[in-house]
Swiss-Prot record:
Key words of the record: Ribonucleoprotein, Ribosomal protein
Subunit organization: Part of the 50S ribosomal subunit. Contacts protein L32.
One CC-aspect GO term: cytosolic large ribosomal subunit
Entry keyword annotation includes Ribosomal protein: yes
Similarity field: Belongs to the bacterial ribosomal protein bL17 family.
Name of the coding gene: rplQ
Organism in which the protein naturally occurs: Anaplasma marginale (strain St. Maries)
HAMAP family for this protein: Ribosomal_bL17 (MF_01368)
One MF term in the entry's GO annotations: structural constituent of ribosome
The UniProt record lists the keyword Thylakoid: no
Protein name: Large ribosomal subunit protein bL17
Example GO biological process: translation
Amino acid sequence: MRHGISCRKFSRPTAHRLSMLANPAVSLIRHERIVTTVAKAKDLRPFVERLVTVGRRLAKKDPVRGRRLLLSKMGGDLDAVNKLLDVLAKRYARRPGGYTRILKNGFRAGDCAPIAIMEFVDRKEGEPKKVAEG
């Protein structure tokens, strides 16, 4: 019986599954919005929420320890860790949780897998990127 098991295995070994969580987490932190399958988004949400909470709590108390802990969880991506500690930790300083949302977005063309958009709550909509002419 699978009582109390909170995560999916995705038919992958543990190391692959952990890197499969770390890579989209880094992309989500960098771009603040990603497109993925619904199952992966539901598994990614608690992982990212914990990262933001750790960054939020340790940004002021012990920034060196927080930076090292986040680097180990996020595959050593320093740019994403810096953004998490400098931008996202300040943005969600007074928010007790619930930093992400999952919006269902139809089905993938190739295999009809349900697709979702995962994004941070309270994110600023950026200016549209200008296309270089010429």
